[in-house]
């Protein structure tokens, strides 16, 4: 399948955050029409899109109406909060969902993707179990042991995740997970805590025609289950990199379709352990905006349209550092931008979100240098210069 025989194409983004904004810009550079859909007005991708719509994407009827109105060539999910059953219905009617409706459904439900990896494909993952009530959580926690990690089966951006050291923390973790769940889900996954040396994202590109491709591995650090900084290339032994690539190829092949996938791993001294997967550009991959000849958004676009990807080249050691809001309010303004940009090989992305709240990601600093350590320090300096205030 290819959509590159005739451009432009009409691309509908379901989710219009900062990742969708960068994808929309990449799509428009090749003349495509972008329709940005999200649950709130003035979302980042809406600011650059050709058209937009504000709906609840958990509402199947609202999804039907917006697809009927705009008649997209491709439907491209960008977030988790979508009625994925409706995507399958669209696909059954001949519409193209990226990468596939099945892949979107599996990866937006942690139980589906974990069972696919561990049970169907036989891949090494953390030991895990599910719980649908607090009493069941107590039982599986005792079986798997402590420390452990509790996550909602359906959530995004680290919402509802906790690391549990002892049984008296379970009730608070259960309450936090249910509060962070998407939709009406009352199910959590509890998994053993892996004492990893490094967490990495392997950006994996499936093409309609052609081999599966990989970007150099990206290391990242998280707090509260959400990414704070990433760097590329991550230090990884050749044998462990080969393991990660083989696992990523196997999982993405099982999901099918075309596009860029963010495949996450825990790295220990002896192995890489599959963690999670996103069937779209990944937040830790924003570092590729400065690190690669083709960033993750351009790679995703080329893959879904069936355009060639002759080479993926690392331009130099690079890093990203998030810029977080500290306060709440509307119409945020940014100070310190000039100071942040005073060093060479530094760039910023300020997302243009219409409101702010504590710990909300409002921008990212990007840096390149002679080493990963220097790039990380430079990105951190740049991010620290930027302050955000409500108008």
UniProtKB/Swiss-Prot annotation:
Record's keyword annotation contains Ligase: yes
Keywords associated with the record: ATP-binding, Ligase, Magnesium, Metal-binding, Nucleotide-binding, Purine biosynthesis
Keyword hit for Coiled coil: no
Gene Ontology MF terms: ATP binding; magnesium ion binding; phosphoribosylglycinamide formyltransferase 2 activity; phosphoribosylglycinamide formyltransferase activity
GO BP terms in the entry: 'de novo' IMP biosynthetic process
Biological function: Involved in the de novo purine biosynthesis. Catalyzes the transfer of formate to 5-phospho-ribosyl-glycinamide (GAR), producing 5-phospho-ribosyl-N-formylglycinamide (FGAR). Formate is provided by PurU via hydrolysis of 10-formyl-tetrahydrofolate.
Family designation: Belongs to the PurK/PurT family.
Reaction equations catalysed: N(1)-(5-phospho-beta-D-ribosyl)glycinamide + formate + ATP = N(2)-formyl-N(1)-(5-phospho-beta-D-ribosyl)glycinamide + ADP + phosphate + H(+)
GO cellular component, one term: cytosol
Quaternary structure and partners: Homodimer.
EC identifiers of the protein: 6.3.1.21
Enzyme class name: ligase
The protein's name: Formate-dependent phosphoribosylglycinamide formyltransferase
Annotated metabolic or biological route of this protein: Purine metabolism; IMP biosynthesis via de novo pathway; N(2)-formyl-N(1)-(5-phospho-D-ribosyl)glycinamide from N(1)-(5-phospho-D-ribosyl)glycinamide (formate route): step 1/1
Residues that, per the record, bind Mg(2+): 264, 276
Annotated source species: Synechococcus elongatus (strain ATCC 33912 / PCC 7942 / FACHB-805) (Anacystis nidulans R2)
Binding annotation for N(1)-(5-phospho-beta-D-ribosyl)glycinamide: 18-19, 78, 283, 353, 360-361
Binding site for ATP: 110, 151, 156-161, 191-194, 199
Every ATP-grasp domain range: 115-305
């Amino acid at each position: 399948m290819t959509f590159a025989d005739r451009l432009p194409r009409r691309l509908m983004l379901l989710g219009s955050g900062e990742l969708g904004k960068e994808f929309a810009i990449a799509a428009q550079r090749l003349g495509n029409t972008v329709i940005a859909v999200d649950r709130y007005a003035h979302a980042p991708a809406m600011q650059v899109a050709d058209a937009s719509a504000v709906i609840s994407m958990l509402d199947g009827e609202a999804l039907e109406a917006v697809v009927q109105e705009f008649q997209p060539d491709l439907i491209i999910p960008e977030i988790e909060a979508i009625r994925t059953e409706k995507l399958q219905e669209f696909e059954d009617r001949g519409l193209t969902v990226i990468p596939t409706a099945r892949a979107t459904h599996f990866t937006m439900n942690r139980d589906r993707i974990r069972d696919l990896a561990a049970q169907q494909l036989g891949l090494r993952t953390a030991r895990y179990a599910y719980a649908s009530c607090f009493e069941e959580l107590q039982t599986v926690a005792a079986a798997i042991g402590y420390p452990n990690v509790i996550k909602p089966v359906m959530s995004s951006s680290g919402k509802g995740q906790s690391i549990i050291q002892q049984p008296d923390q379970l009730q608070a973790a259960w309450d936090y997970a249910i509060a962070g769940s998407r939709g009406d889900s009352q199910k959590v996954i509890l998994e053993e805590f892996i004492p990893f040396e490094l967490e990495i994202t392997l950006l994996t590109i499936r093409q309609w025609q052609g081999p599966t491709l990989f970007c150099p591995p990206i290391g990242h650090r998280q707090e509260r289950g959400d990414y704070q900084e990433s760097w590329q290339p991550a230090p990884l032994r050749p044998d462990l990199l080969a393991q990660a690539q083989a696992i990523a190829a196997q999982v993405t092949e099982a999901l099918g379709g075309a596009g860029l996938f963010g495949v996450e791993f825990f790295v220990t001294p002896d192995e890489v352990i599959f963690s999670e997967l996103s069937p779209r550009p990944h937040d830790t991959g924003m570092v590729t905006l400065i690190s690669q000849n083709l960033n993750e958004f351009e790679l995703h676009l080329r893959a879904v349209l069936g355009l060639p990807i002759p080479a993926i080249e690392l331009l130099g050691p690079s890093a990203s550092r998030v810029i977080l809001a500290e306060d709440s309010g509307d119409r945020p303004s940014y100070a310190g931008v000039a100071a942040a940009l005073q060093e060479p090989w530094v760039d910023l992305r300020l997302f243009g979100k219409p409101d702010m709240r504590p710990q909300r990601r409002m921008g990212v600093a990007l840096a390149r240098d002679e080493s990963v350590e220097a790039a990380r320090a430079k990105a951190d300096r740049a991010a620290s210069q930027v302050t955000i205030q409500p108008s």
